């Protein structure tokens, strides 16, 4: 199929999904696994008030490894290190805004860090995995919670 490119914007004529990254940080407290989570703001409305891993879109020209650490700081104020790819989720309907391929990274953080909500998050906190369900977690993040619950 012949695709037209644009010399002005650099577009290649392909309609491609966006790439997102999410930071998966966990700790053990009082015999329970807790994950560093944000409570989503009003956009998209389907996820308003639901828990999600801190994350966001990869900027043009940005390495996903840098993006996941940037998003972690922007949304929680927590610095991370050693991002390691945990999962890739890319179902076309996984995000109500548009087709997004999500890269979930395990990220090391200080287990005593005190998250502070930033960017578009309502709140940020360490949340016990046992308190999370499909009803209070945004989108397919519950699948990743299942992965880490079963692995630890």
Where are these regions (language model features)?
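Short, glycine/serine-rich, charged loops/turns that create anion-binding
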Residues: 30, 42, 90
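Beta-strand scaffold of nucleotide-dependent catalytic cores
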Residues: 36-39
């Amino acid at each position: 199929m012949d695709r037209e490119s644009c010399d002005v914007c650099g577009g290649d004529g392909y309609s491609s999904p966006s790439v997102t990254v999410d930071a998966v940080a966990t700790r053990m407290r009082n015999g329970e696994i807790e994950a560093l989570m944000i409570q989503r703001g009003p956009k998209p409305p389907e996820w308003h008030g639901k828990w999600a891993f801190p994350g966001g879109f990869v900027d043009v020209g940005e390495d996903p490894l840098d993006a996941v650490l940037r998003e972690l700081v922007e949304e929680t104020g927590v610095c991370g290190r050693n991002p390691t790819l945990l999962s890739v989720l890319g179902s076309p309907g996984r995000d109500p805004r548009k087709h997004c391929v999500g890269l979930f990274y395990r990220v090391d953080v200080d287990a005593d860090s005190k998250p502070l909500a930033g960017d578009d998050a309502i709140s940020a906190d360490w949340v016990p995995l046992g308190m999370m369900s499909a009803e209070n977690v945004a989108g397919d993040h519950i699948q990743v919670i299942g992965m880490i619950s079963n692995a630890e």
